[in-house]
Amino acid sequence: MTDRKNGLTYADAGVDIDAGNRLVDLIKPMVRATARAGADAEIGGFGGLFDLKAAGFTDPVLVAANDGVGTKVKIAIETGIHDTIGIDLVAMSVNDLVVQGAEPLFFLDYFACGKLDPEVASAIVAGIAVGCREAGCALIGGETAEMPGLYKDGDYDLAGFAVGAAERGTLLPGRDIAAGDAVIGLASSGVHSNGYSLVRKIVEASGLGFSVPAPFAPVTTLGGALLTPTRLYVKSCLRAIRETGAVKGLAHITGGGFTDNIPRVLPKHLGIRIDLSRLTVLPVFKWLARQGGIAELELLRTFNCGVGMIAIVRRDAVEQVVDVLTQAGERVAPLGSVIEASGDRVVYDNHLDLAM
């Protein structure tokens, strides 16, 4: 084959294969550290493998979820803090799996950028690996797409894909959810990964930079505080499901807040009544509400307001479920109950405490 000395190369077009290979070398140890029963977490092949029998399943139903982290990546890019956004990526998908009673088994990521920086990408994958280990799932593959002309240099986007399993007959929500069941809330770690277009607009209007001390948490920067990773609820919720047998349903509070997410796990004839005075509203939400002049109902439909997961449990087992979740490291509060729906599916009593 003739080698044209002056011919164009892929690198001339902006795609650096050598940088991609360097990235693979950097992340292999991180990926290997996520190995679990059923997967060796080795990368480099054309596909990742998972052995359900080795993982201990006998009659499993597979559950899949995928998600991203929205414009939270813009804050990571602008601050240069890339080592936590991968935790968000994992959490957004695996929290959706546990809502259905499934144990996360494996995860795959998609990373797209304009110009590949192996150090930045490896920092992101390091966060993904942390999230996978905490969720108990193996990182078995992914895609790195360098696309000059589509993304600006320095910009990137992420998507994650998770697959879990539950034994047949154990999936949530249960068919026995009924009026009178108790509703408890599991505390969030912060804004998590939803509503960041509004967050960024509020920060811009405030005139503050991401490097200044956070008005609601002066011990850290505003950017660092807003990049607090999404909480992973997998191990605590699976423990509560398995040890108590009293968890009838779970709702991951993401985009749409309480208003749109809770009805997704309820039969159509049922709703939920929440006492807002029982919510411990995190300082970040108080600041956003005040700085942005956000109405209470808008706040409840946009952000988690301090509760990242809702559990619907048997009324007679509330104390047992709360004890298990607390022992697993969760901060839990009773919020209300399931009701017969006669209009709005989510009914709010009292008001959020938004005083700074």
From Swiss-Prot:
<dbReference type="InterPro" id="IPR016188">
    <property type="entry name" value="PurM-like_N"/>
</dbReference>
<dbReference type="GO" id="GO:0006189">
    <property type="term" value="P:'de novo' IMP biosynthetic process"/>
</dbReference>
<dbReference type="GO" id="GO:0004637">
    <property type="term" value="F:phosphoribosylamine-glycine ligase activity"/>
</dbReference>
<keyword id="KW-0547">Nucleotide-binding</keyword>
<dbReference type="GO" id="GO:0005524">
    <property type="term" value="F:ATP binding"/>
</dbReference>
<dbReference type="Pfam" id="PF02769">
    <property type="entry name" value="AIRS_C"/>
</dbReference>
<dbReference type="InterPro" id="IPR036921">
    <property type="entry name" value="PurM-like_N_sf"/>
</dbReference>
<dbReference type="Pfam" id="PF00586">
    <property type="entry name" value="AIRS"/>
</dbReference>
<keyword id="KW-0436">Ligase</keyword>
<dbReference type="InterPro" id="IPR036676">
    <property type="entry name" value="PurM-like_C_sf"/>
</dbReference>
<protein>
    <recommendedName>
        <fullName>Phosphoribosylformylglycinamidine cyclo-ligase</fullName>
        <ecNumber>6.3.3.1</ecNumber>
    </recommendedName>
</protein>
<keyword id="KW-0067">ATP-binding</keyword>
<dbReference type="GO" id="GO:0046084">
    <property type="term" value="P:adenine biosynthetic process"/>
</dbReference>
<dbReference type="GO" id="GO:0004641">
    <property type="term" value="F:phosphoribosylformylglycinamidine cyclo-ligase activity"/>
</dbReference>
<dbReference type="InterPro" id="IPR010918">
    <property type="entry name" value="PurM-like_C_dom"/>
</dbReference>
<dbReference type="InterPro" id="IPR004733">
    <property type="entry name" value="PurM_cligase"/>
</dbReference>
<dbReference type="GO" id="GO:0005829">
    <property type="term" value="C:cytosol"/>
</dbReference>
<comment type="pathway">
    <text>Purine metabolism; IMP biosynthesis via de novo pathway; 5-amino-1-(5-phospho-D-ribosyl)imidazole from N(2)-formyl-N(1)-(5-phospho-D-ribosyl)glycinamide: step 2/2.</text>
</comment>
<keyword id="KW-0658">Purine biosynthesis</keyword>
<keyword id="KW-0963">Cytoplasm</keyword>
<comment type="similarity">
    <text>Belongs to the AIR synthase family.</text>
</comment>
